[in-house]
Design a protein with these regions (language model features):
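Structural signature of the Rossmann-like NAD(P)-dependent dehydrogenase/reductase core
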Residues: 4-9, 53-59, 91, 117
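Substrate-positioning beta->alpha
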Residues: 65-70, 84-107, 113-117
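Conserved beta-loop-beta element that borders a ligand/cofactor-binding pocket
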Residues: 40-63
Length: 212
């Protein structure tokens, strides 16, 4: 108590929706998101508002991150299964911009106490994202539209299902889920790294580490 806290949460607390705002009602869609929602609630119950900053960075990628590595590796193979036509929207956010948001949340920074959505400058479709990844990797990519019903059949196979047709892929790449960053923008915080630049830097790091 008495010490400011910055908590990194997730937009998934508000569910899989497009344009979620800081005041969107909670609707966590998975165990991870439920744990983050509970953490937010606990912190809000024990800390006074002036000591708590909660950041919800959206779809984070960048050097040092391995959570999105499977996406980059799948694109590297030259083909990528899309949920439907890959039209679901998301907002990729470069890790460096998340670090900037944390610094901006320190005492005296432009992001004061409260809840803030943090996102990249572009909202793109899944199809646009994987093509941008392919461009950064310098590979030709074939995108394969997979009807939702096929994903459903694959999920019914359980452990026998191809990992490219997983439940998490259906959820993350099959529905709009991106944040509205107007509140942070109004406070003067703006993302600096665009998608093409961020992906190029990420691919370079993966290659330098022998991961691609």
């Amino acid at each position: 108590r008495g010490v400011p806290m910055i908590h990194l949460s997730t937009p998934g607390v508000a569910g899989l929706i497009g344009g979620s705002r800081e005041d969107s009602p909670p609707a966590p869609w998975g165990a991870y998101e439920e744990s983050k929602a509970e953490a937010e609630s606990i912190l809000q119950s024990v800390l006074p508002p002036e000591l708590l900053t909660i950041l919800r960075p959206d779809f984070v990628y960048g050097p040092g991150d391995r959570h999105k590595l499977s996406l980059f590796r799948q694109v590297r193979r030259g083909w990528f299964p899309l949920v439907g036509l890959g039209g679901a929207k998301l907002r990729p956010t470069f890790a460096g911009d998340v670090s900037r948001a944390v610094l901006a949340s320190l005492p005296g920074g432009i992001l004061g106490p409260g809840l803030w959505n943090i996102g990249g400058p572009e909202v793109v479709s899944v199809a646009e994202l994987v093509r941008a990844v392919a461009a950064a990797e310098g590979v030709r990519l074939a995108t394969i539209p997979v009807p939702r019903v096929i994903f459903g059949i694959a999920l019914a196979l359980g452990p026998l299902a191809p990992r490219q047709l997983s439940r998490s892929r259906l959820q993350l790449f099959g529905k709009d889920h991106w944040v509205d960053i107007a509140r942070a923008s109004d406070a003067g915080f703006h993302p600096e790294t665009g998608l093409a630049d961020g992906l190029s830097r990420t691919v370079s790091w993966y290659k330098s580490e022998g991961l691609l």
